[in-house]
Amino acid sequence: MTYKIMAINAGSSSLKFQLLNMPQGALLCQGLIERIGLPEARFMLKTSAQKWQETLPIADHHEAVTLLLEALTGRGILSSLQEIDGVGHRVAHGGERFKDAALVCDDTLREIERLAELAPLHNPVNALGIRLFRQRLPAVPAVAVFDTAFHQTLAPEAWLYPLPWRYYAELGIRRYGFHGTSHHYVSSALAEKLGVPLSALRVVSCHLGNGCSVCAIKGGQSVNTSMGFTPQSGVMMGTRSGDIDPSILPWLVEKEGKSALQLSQLLNNESGLLGVSGVSSDYRDVEQAADAGNERAALALSLFAERIRATIGSYIMQMGGLDALIFTGGIGEHSARARATICRNLHFLGLALDDEKNQRSATFIQADNALVKVAVINTNEELMIARDVMRLALPQARELTVSA
């Protein structure tokens, strides 16, 4: 038996979606509605056979959801909306409450909205997306899949900041971690490809895109991760600084009179690859500039790799060794240069790359005599979301989900 599951990612001015046939994971359609609220919004929808694109005014997310659902039947992808068996929603922040994906009910929604203080840019619109789909598909079960949930297995030594206790107890300031759905998916996919239980592996997963995070996975559980209270922390990213000396911030307030908003803009939108290179936040553009002799671009690439290498090294120490290293995300999946720079001179760990395999982004790119497996795995958060819908919302499908 097959089930049609929708995976939804609602952003502040966008709506990304996939419709999958489960448990096989076959993609029926995918698309994006962007620039919501503007007179020239764009709606893109594609199947394996066709692609549609339209520019039109879309006033709000309510219109976007209506447009999407009408297109599914209007384009013949579904004969009826009753064919949809479940909907999964990506939610940025689950706080300490959600240690797993959760069936959507009124209480779940209220908690997602309450947690908006921890993710003010994402949780409110995530909750709005859930409400709108519940209104249009009231009989269809829905599941909220939290980006933070996979990291709720961290020990206190990994998630607690050495601040006065009340800042954690009263304000919830601690490491939460993000990209959890991606790290969970690629580590599970690795174990499947190796034919080894994930519980038997020590893995470091590097999700490298415009946002970057590194995750240590031991015994099938996240034991450390580079992103913390916000997705701004950790390793260097496209426009985000990652970890810096915190005293730089009050120094800038005193020296340049910067406001909290200006500091946030500096750390989140003006730093990282863009800030160091002065060229771009796109790794490919910085690579091109470095190859043309731009010294700051070359330095940006080296700094990017060094921050990741240092994080990987600390996680290897924490886990007492390493069985496999995973690269995923736009940079991790497509940049042979990034992978080679991060993995250079690590023979003493039993980690070495095969240059030819790395250049063609093979699934496994380690040298033949290397002890540590190095894998390039395309992330698929939507498939992970659909699996969570199957597991939690469709009891009759649970056995199929486990075996898939």
Swiss-Prot record:
Its function, per the record, reads: Works with phosphate acetyltransferase (pta) to capture exogenous propionate and regenerate propionyl-CoA during degradation of 1,2-propanediol (1,2-PD).
Top-tier EC class: transferase
- The protein's name in its UniProt record: Propionate kinase
Its subcellular locations are: Cytoplasm
- State the pathway, as annotated in the record: Polyol metabolism; 1,2-propanediol degradation
The Swiss-Prot or TrEMBL record describes its family as follows: Belongs to the acetokinase family. PduW subfamily.
Q: Does the keyword Ribosomal protein apply?
A: no
